[in-house]
Amino acid sequence: MAVAEAKPQYSHAEKKRFRKSFGKQTDIMPIPNLLEIQLKSYRDFLQTDTKLSEQLNTGLHAAFSSVFPIESFSGNARLEYVGYKLGEPAFDVRECKLRGLTYSAPLRVKIRLVVLDKDASDDPKPIKDIREQDVFMGEIPLMTDVGTFVVNGTERVVVSQLHRSPGVIFEHDKGKTHSSGKLLYSARIIPYRGSWLDFEFDPKDCVYVRIDRRRKLPVTILLRALGYEAEDILSEFFETTHCHLKNGEYHIDLIPQRLRGEIASFDIHVPETGELIVEQGRRITARHIKQMEKSQMQDLVVPRDYLIGKTLAKNIIDTSTGEFLAQANDEITEELLDAMANHGILQIDMIYTNDLDHGSYISDTLKIDPTGSQLEALVEIYRMMRPGEPPTKEAAEALFKNLFFVEERYDLSAVGRMKFNRRVGIKSDEGPGTLTKEDILSVIKTLIDIRNGIGMVDDIDHLGNRRVRSVGEMTENQFRVGLVRVERAVKERLSLVESENLMPQDLINAKPVSAAIKEFFGSSQLSQFMDQVNPLSGVTHKRRVSALGPGGLTRERAGFEVRDVHTTHYGRVCPIETPEGPNIGLINSLSVYARTNEYGFIETPCRKVVNGRVTDEVEYLSAIEEVDQYIAQSNVELDAQGNILADLVPCRHQNEFSLTTPDKINYMDVSPKQIVSVAASLIPFLEHDDANRALMGSNMQRQAVPTLRSEKPLVGTGMERIVASDSGVSVVAKRGGVIDLVDASRIVVRVNDDETTAGETGVDIYNLTKYFRSNQDTCINQRPIVSTGDRIQRGDVLADGPCTDMGELALGQNLLVAFMPWNGYNFEDSILISERIVHDDRFTTIHIEELTCIARDTKLGTEEITADIPNVGESALSNLDESGVVYIGAEVKAGDILVGKVTPKGETQLTPEEKLLRAIFGEKASDVKDSSLRVPSGMNGTVIDVQVFTRDGLEKDARAKSIEEEHLARVRKDLIDERRIREEDIYHRVSHLLLDKVATGGPGSLKPGSKITQDYLDKVEREKWFDIRIEDDAISQQLEQLSKQLELLTKEMEKRFNDSRKKIIQGDDLAPGVLKIVKVYLAVKRRIQPGDKMAGRHGNKGVISIVVPVEDMPHMEDGTAVDIVLNPLGVPSRMNIGQVLETHLGLAAKGLGRKIAQMLDEKQTPEAIKAYLEKIYNHDGVQRVNLKCLNDDELMTLADNLRAGVPMATPVFDGATEQEIKSMLQLADLPADGKTVLIDGRTGNKFDNPVTVGYMYMLKLNHLVDDKMHARSTGSYSLVTQQPLGGKAQFGGQRFGEMEVWALEAYGAAYTLQEMLTVKSDDVGGRTKIYKNIVDGDHRMDPGMPESFNVLLKEIRALGIDIELEHD
């Protein structure tokens, strides 16, 4: 029985090997789970752990709520949604991968059918009948613990999308539309779902509207359609100037500010004093306006000419007769003024406009508006949306209403409403999902304000205007699409409900829903085949945000601005990691600490600063919230109390970098690495690398192939452990306890008592993944790093996966590198390696190929998998068993048979001789042809696994049965171990209850009244302990309970075994016409060789040019030969100096390890070793290691693990300084300049100058020469041109193109050219002839007509021109 101890400071794996950190700052908050963006999004979509009453209106729940209730056309029946629940998945993740299934759970929705009494006259009609039922709505794919989906047996990732946020956006065309370069402003209302609404200015300053990017209409048509008259429109958009006719003079109500900038057309006097303020012809300035305000002028007498040309704000009507003298927006003319005077109209209302900041845009637009009423406006919009259809009043009204004002068709969403309200200045963040009249007006007003110079346009690339759409949201949208299709079908069937007694199940067909989901996960642009080369590539793939995809950008249309790094990317999106090539800047990676908020905007954490003092309180800020804050960097100097010491602090404010005083600072960055992504945070000395090279380094780490023996980097950044544990490739303890049993394929843990809840088993069994194929054919293999009896805590690493070493990410190998030229073999980034690397299998990788053989039911009969194959010798069948399937462990090469299969041939007419042979020998071989699965060309390896899938109902062959038996044995083994531990636990409690108690009787020599001793219990069989009778009734009852527990345990184990057995032995659901599938897995060992691509972590990539014998490599004075020689010219021009610093620090790390090894070999005391380790780990830096918490054994284990070198961590932007590297080199007794005298291995002479030598972490990338090299003799040809196909996959030839032909022509190599164009390419007759000739040993060729020439002739004839060749 395991009992928990206090939580230790370090994990089990960490204690075995500490990493010395050079970080100057302590991280204030732990790095959030790297896969949280995926896991949280899908968790919110499913809401499986939430009660129905507490479910939020998101995900599945929101999709159902938005479509239901569904009413019939007559309104007499409706379907209501009550709730849903997800069942258990039929197979676990591992089974789904093996069987090629989708890991999903059945979705059952509780639907209520309400039938109303249609004959009743009441309104609302009374309910006649209610029927409730659980309806199956298809399977919903489940997310695995590591954020992936298993679809048809392959792991996929749904990448998050960065798209334009719904809301309103104001922009201008940057002067590109019109030749004058005038800025044309526009506004666009983007809904989450529905039609786009654009408002735009044209070069003549009229305002237009477009719906869904169709033909533009004057904006006043839209306003009229909303019910506004010309007067209303003008009063909304313009200030009014009132003019009164008094005593034959025109007086205007004076607002002095409105005159500013105008040229006075008459003298302006102060009425009381007659003082002249402005002379005629002078421009009115701010000084003049001040004078007017000072003299408190209320009105201004203006000459009649001043009014001519002004625009009316209201209709002018003679009240006595009702006669219209002028319409609103008409210009005032001489005639109009006369008519008004004649009709006794004394007041004129004019709109106020000027050229500076009160443009007459809406007035001008009204002038070109052809419509005069709401109906005409609606008809005009109808004509634009539905050209060619005759409009009716009802159709026009319905169309316009459905565009923006109906929830089913239009939805701004919560985000869109929030963004909209904030942009147009509405105080609340909430509101309706559809548009209102006021919304449209406020957008037009804001647009006109911007045109008038008030306010700014928006920046589309600002992360406040782009939001992340994650898996959950995309799946919900897809689900809603499926439900809407269901709704249409259900509506039609609902009318039958009244006549027939139907249940909800009969009405709903779930096919459209499951088809929509299947389509999304199977073929959406954002549902991608998971990048599984190594753990880092998996993590990065899940943290990717893409601007491409449905509803996003396209590569061709994306300009430079969208791709560029934006100031708001700081701490949210990595400025370094993005692909090279056409997708640059469109696909990004989230920064280490970034997360998305409820609206989908990316947030980054900041420490709160109050009055110049930094607190430990952390707040997440989105790009919108960050704008007005002053945010300091994380490396600001602080005193012990957290006060900022500097007088001026560099900070970010209004998206700019500036210096400011400490009292203004509101926030401070959490960590220096918060601006970069996971991959970039793994590059040591990133701050010394050029950004372009850092980009390549980030991308190439993702292509590193897992080596046979992973080796941790000597120089890391401290992120390695986090990436390895979050990636899900290593096995992490779910609960603490003691290791009970370990072997290569599983770990059994006896869980601590206080970590088990009632009804839970106190045993955790971890089955390890052994030699499993990844999506990229690399090998996924886990190996335990714990031993029996070890005490572990929750979260400890129990087993290393691919590319992990003691729970740390380990993508490559530490190699002794020298920067020097070597006989031209490292020209142009080539790399020279030592034979020792090959010999020690440092970069040997295992690749697993999956080969599949399918037996089908054909027209001529069934294909059969068998070892009885016609015309094949015994030796070719030596690796097959009696079922015709290859043995596990067989070493095979190209052309070997893996699975024997025969296919029936068509019946052919037999010759008399064949008939005789068949009669004598019963020969049936001619009926079938050999269609066995063979090893493809260029491949050889070892068979490591075979899977046989048989169609349900067919008899299984011997091999399939033996595979099943193995599987059952594994299940049985797990159950036996679990049962053993749980039984021991129960018997331990029984013995605890019985010891020293007085017995009244029992088996064996137990006399009544005697005490029960341990000796007695040891002699009696454990099963009979329950027969001992005891005086104490309470204890007797407890014993009885424990006895029942044992019985229940036995039953539970039997049930679990039977369930597993049923699953294992059931037939497989194969595609139609498929009888049997055999999958063979080959492990291919690839050693490193010339042509393979290698790289460091700083973008320093190259191809191996030669493998040099160890004795020829340059070596140091102590005889140590270097492993790899790089060209020093690869450093200065590339500006990635990080690799040089890494080399120096790597040398120090290795030297320190050597000194520790020396101390261990000299058998020095633990105290002496501890003192030396203290010097290494704790003589500087903030992030110290507490060695006091280790006992002597742990200390010696640690020291032993440090023999190969002391791992160092130099966090990005907070790494080791030059001085610190030098002090480490001195501590290891190495030269402080990191240079060493090298001796040429071939001559034995010293090189002229000392050379930079040290340890660099090198990766082998997934660009292997074995996969790329290819040669062809004869093969398949293109159908039309008869030329050989191209590419390795088609077993194609090399293209001899136009330029190559010129080269041969230039050399006059006529015969070579002739054979290139004829017998080696598309001269069909000639190539068969030469093949025969070569076989016969005759090397002559007889060229004929190339087939492509015949194609050309046929094309010319198709044009009606007849060409015939004349033969001499």
Curated annotation (Swiss-Prot):
One Pfam family matching this protein: RNA_pol_Rpb2_3
Xref: Gene3D superfamilies: 2.40.50.100, 2.40.50.150, 3.90.1100.10, DNA-directed RNA polymerase, beta subunit, external 1 domain, DNA-directed RNA polymerase, subunit 2, domain 6, RNA polymerase alpha subunit dimerisation domain, RNA polymerase Rpb2, domain 2
UniProt feature coiled coil, ranges: none
EC identifiers of the protein: 2.7.7.6
Keywords: DNA-directed RNA polymerase, Nucleotidyltransferase, Transcription, Transferase
PROSITE patterns registered for this protein in UniProt: RNA_POL_BETA (PS01166)
InterPro entries according to UniProt: DNA-dir_RNA_pol_bsu_ext_1_sf, DNA-dir_RNA_pol_bsu_external_1, DNA-dir_RNA_pol_su2, DNA-dir_RNAP_su2_dom, DNA-dir_RNAP_su2_hyb_sf, RNA_pol_bsu_bac, RNA_pol_bsu_CS, RNA_pol_bsu_protrusion
GO cellular component: DNA-directed RNA polymerase complex
Biological-process GO terms, alphabetical: DNA-templated transcription
TM regions (residue ranges): none
Job of this protein: DNA-dependent RNA polymerase catalyzes the transcription of DNA into RNA using the four ribonucleoside triphosphates as substrates.
Name by which UniProt lists this protein: DNA-directed RNA polymerase subunit beta
Organism: Legionella pneumophila subsp. pneumophila (strain Philadelphia 1 / ATCC 33152 / DSM 7513)
